[in-house]
Amino acid sequence: NPYFRTKDSASELEAAGVDLISPQFANTNVDLPALPAEAYRLVEDKSLYAVMDIGGDDRGAYALGRYTPFLLEEGNYRMAFVANPCRPLTRTPEEALEVMREIEAAGGLPFTAIVNNANLAHETTPETVLAAVPYMKKLSEMSGLPVWMTSAEETVAAGLTGKVPRLLPMKLQ
């Protein structure tokens, strides 16, 4: 999958103590919704805290589906819908809700929260993120899910301090 960019930061993640498990074909033009067998330890080893990036559509969620029985049995998971109103398929809360439901149906797991990730890549400003607050509120009302946090690149986040609750500044790789 050419869009799986986490693999680009493998050395930085490993240096920070993060064990990256990625598909064999990550960062290639092969787009298979599959994860390696070693990913099972994420649901089998209860001492681990795992973050899984399944992508922004139902195709990535199919790969998650194999873990659904383990996650539902435990009931100890958080699955966030990372919403960006600047993307073509989620420009309105209604479109975002449709994508959300498609992902849930494909993976067999319900979302538990929403993350405001409004961005225009390197053109993002604090105003870009703040303009998405009403969108996120409406998506929250429509879905019945809370807006868990707002994520933004570090320099953008600096302009959001005190303006949005639960701000997560991110360093882009």
Model-found features: residue ranges?
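N-terminal phosphate/diphosphate-binding loop that engages ATP/GTP or pyrophosphate donors
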Residues: N1-D31, L35-E38
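Conserved beta-strand segments of alpha/beta enzyme cores
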Residues: D19-I21, P146, R166-L168
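Switch II (G3) loop of P-loop NTPases
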Residues: P23-T28, S47-L64
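Glycine-rich phosphate-binding loop signature in dinucleotide/nucleotide-binding domains
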Residues: V43-A50, E74-G75
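Conserved catalytic-core segment of NTP-binding enzymes
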Residues: D58-K163
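Active-site regions of enzymes building and remodeling cell-envelope glycoconjugates
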Residues: L160-Q173
